[in-house]
Amino acid sequence: MRIVSTVEELRSALPMDQTIGFVPTMGYLHEGHMSLVENARRENDVVVMSIFVNPTQFGPNEDLDRYPRDFERDEKLAREAGVDVLFYPTTETMYPLDMARVTVRHGADVLCGASRPGHFDGVLTIVSKLFNLVQPTRAYFGLKDAQQVALIEGYVRDYFVPVEIRRCPIIREETGLAKSSRNVYLSDIETVEASRIFSALTMAREALDAGQQVDEVKRQLIERLDEIPNSQIDYVELVDYPTLGAVSSDSTELLLAVAIQFERARLIDNVIWKKG
């Protein structure tokens, strides 16, 4: 595995005539990231991973400074997973002038974007920069961040970016808790209680399967999540996927998405329901 940190080093490490699978991350790798690498490894000649904690997607009162970082650990995991090129740039490398940024016009003011203004502008700005640098054949994103995946797919279509976006399933603990770098902030008791999030989402999906109306499913989902102690609901939403718009009679896929705030960790999770 080759570790590079500058644009020049990255460009010299990229192959000219082979397919590239790209896995962008913010580090503190876990099994969810490893599953993305596994998919990339299976479908491409070369696998490139980036590790960069992107400052422009954090708000002024968010956890940028305390976001978990352990490059030595990440390097070991990336190497063991079969990553060929690990790109580990500085903020100065990724934002040399910070003259221009991507602005998201639709879908960024709902779900996570409702309480994190500017977040997805930062996400798509860094994704745009990384796509320009790596020029991957395929890029791999986990559906735990389903809103992010939908917006990246829209960006790729709008800007005619020649990359295939691969949606990858959520990797979970045995309890159902979605794997996340922020799980490290949970206490032992909170870790147990947080597993109830997926249980509530699963029951909501089953209610849709049984033909219950969207409003009633949402009401029941809120009730179940409200029962989780020492937590606060940030949002509970059912939206059309991948448009992220209101559910209509034409909707064939629905995203059931939630965000729950514990003392030191804000967790997101979701399930996708398909009609028929």
Swiss-Prot record:
Write out the GO biological process terms: pantothenate biosynthetic process
> What are the annotated GO cellular component locations?
cytosol
Q: What is its EC number?
A: 6.3.2.1
Q: What is its main location?
A: cytoplasm
Q: In which pathway does it act?
A: Cofactor biosynthesis; (R)-pantothenate biosynthesis; (R)-pantothenate from (R)-pantoate and beta-alanine: step 1/1
Function noted in UniProt:
Catalyzes the condensation of pantoate with beta-alanine in an ATP-dependent reaction via a pantoyl-adenylate intermediate.
| More info | The reaction proceeds by a bi uni uni bi ping pong mechanism.
Among NCBIfam families, the record links this protein to:
cyt_tran_rel (TIGR00125), panC (TIGR00018)
**PANTHER family, A to Z:** CYTIDYLATE KINASE/PANTOATE-BETA-ALANINE LIGASE, PANTOATE--BETA-ALANINE LIGASE
What name goes with this protein? Answer: Pantothenate synthetase
User: Origin organism of this chain?
Assistant: Exiguobacterium sp. (strain ATCC BAA-1283 / AT1b)
